[in-house]
Amino acid sequence: MPRSLKKGPFVDGHLIKKVDVQNEAGTKNVIKTWSRRSMIVPAMLGHTIAVHNGKIHVPVFVTESMVGHKLGEFSPTRTFRGHVKDDRKSKRR
């Protein structure tokens, strides 16, 4: 169930403050965050945000098509190593 439109998007306060400070200064430094639940808003366009995936911070460059999604969607938490190869020759013996 999506968030109500009358509430507006959720962005952690500390994250939006860091983005606003960089927008005013005109800098585009990497912003580290653990807030995977924050929604990407238009103020974040062009910034690189390093989102924590539980182990490391994954850099995410925010583009226009990402607006409305959450930061955690672009930082995968699980590593897929692939399925085990089906070795039929060894099963015959």
Swiss-Prot record:
GO terms for biological process: ribosomal small subunit assembly; translation. Residues 74-93 are annotated as: Disordered. Gene3D superfamilies: 30s Ribosomal Protein S19, Chain A. One of its GO terms (molecular function) is structural constituent of ribosome. The keyword RNA-binding applies. It holds the Pfam family Ribosomal_S19. Keywords: Ribonucleoprotein, Ribosomal protein, RNA-binding, rRNA-binding. Residues 83-93 have a biased composition (Basic and acidic residues). GO terms for cellular component: cytoplasm; small ribosomal subunit. Belongs to the universal ribosomal protein uS19 family. PANTHER family: RIBOSOMAL PROTEIN S19P FAMILY MEMBER, SMALL RIBOSOMAL SUBUNIT PROTEIN US19M. NCBIfam families: rpsS_bact (TIGR01050). Protein S19 forms a complex with S13 that binds strongly to the 16S ribosomal RNA. This is Small ribosomal subunit protein uS19. It comes from Streptomyces griseus subsp. griseus (strain JCM 4626 / CBS 651.72 / NBRC 13350 / KCC S-0626 / ISP 5235). The gene is rpsS.
